[in-house]
Design a protein with these regions (language model features):
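Bacterial N-terminal signal peptides that target proteins for export
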Residues: 2-13, 19
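C-terminal segment of classical bacterial N-terminal signal peptides
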Residues: 17-25
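N-terminal alpha-helical modules
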Residues: 24-138
Length: 138
């Protein structure tokens, strides 16, 4: 049940980002792996649920981060030098923002809090960025 509430919170975050996106920008949703879905479904909702959620998210983050890096490299190869430099600058700024935001979520009033919030934030933001880079590819 809490897994569903957590997924609803993630979905609302994605919807909010969609409303903020400029008109005409396609917002595809990242599809998490079946292993991640299975891991989240197996979380025991007892006292250790937050560490289990964090472990699932951390494991999936490795896959999503690899996809993001693949899209980034492919896009870099297709850009002009000035565009490549702008993309690199943008990516560096985004990495700093992601770290700061997810560190805040670990400390902030957002449920579930702690390492689980930080891991889930990292996963969600990385998936969104991977989608963005993928959608820029021809």
């Amino acid at each position: 049940m809490q897994h569903l509430a957590l997924r609803a919170t993630q979905a609302l975050s994605i919807l909010a980002i969609g409303w903020l996106a400029p008109a005409g920008v396609a917002m595809a949703e990242y599809h998490y792996s079946p292993q991640y879905e299975t891991c989240m479904d197996k979380v025991d909702l007892g006292a250790l649920k937050n560490s289990q959620w964090a472990a699932c998210a951390d494991q999936e983050l490795k896959k999503v981060d690899a996809a993001l890096n693949t899209y980034y490299r492919k896009l870099q190869q297709q850009l002009e030098p000035e565009q490549r430099e702008a993309l690199k600058k943008s990516q560096r700024a985004w990495l700093q923002y992601r770290e700061a935001r997810c560190s805040f979520e670990a400390l902030g009033p957002v449920a579930p809090g702690g390492a689980a919030s930080q891991s889930l934030c990292m996963l969600e933001m990385t998936a969104q960025k991977a989608d963005y880079l993928r959608d820029l590819l021809p």
